[in-house]
Amino acid sequence: MKHAKQTRAPWILLACLAAIALCIVAAVTLLQPNTKPKNIEIPGTRGNIPAAIQLPAKSARGEELPLVVLCHGFTGNRQGDGHFAPLAEDLAAHGIATVRLDFAGCGDSTEPYANYTLANMAADVDSVIGYMQATYGTGKTALVGHSMGGRLASLYPQLGQY
């Protein structure tokens, strides 16, 4: 009888270690943020604005979600030459929502390129910020831009409504 208990002990220990390892793997998997981008169309003043939103996996209850609007450059698109997607993912991992949009005549926008003006870009950002506030409860908002998008970001306080 003593021999049977001794041969079962290593198996019981191995089963316990396997169960602990499985719990650790499950916990790490559950804690990984599910921050996949979602392609949507946001109603704008001149029609729908193609956009990609990326939200953090979890946000503190009762707190407004911070938002970063990523503005592409001249003749660019919401992918931002491949730099905006990883940036959006990193921001989401740190609890910050992002939205990337295609301005008039760029990316998936169906508007004519002639509508690609700073005033229209600011109006699109207004629509995007308003949509994100109404739909996702976003609060403090920052604009980050590349090239022409950077120019818009620097002039937005004068041009935009938010």
Language-model features: locations:
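Short beta-strand element of the alpha/beta-hydrolase
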Residues: 63-73
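N-terminal Sec-pathway targeting helices
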Residues: 2-19
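Primarily recognizes the serine-hydrolase "nucleophile elbow" in alpha/beta-hydrolase
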Residues: 128-162
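Catalytic nucleophile-loop/oxyanion-hole region of alpha/beta-hydrolase
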Residues: 78-80, 106-138
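Conserved alpha/beta-hydrolase
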Residues: 88-108
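The serine-hydrolase catalytic nucleophile loop
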Residues: 76-88, 103
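Conserved Rossmann-like nucleotide-binding pocket used by diverse enzymes
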Residues: 70, 99, 144
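N-terminal cap/lid segment of alpha/beta-hydrolase-fold proteins
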Residues: 27-63
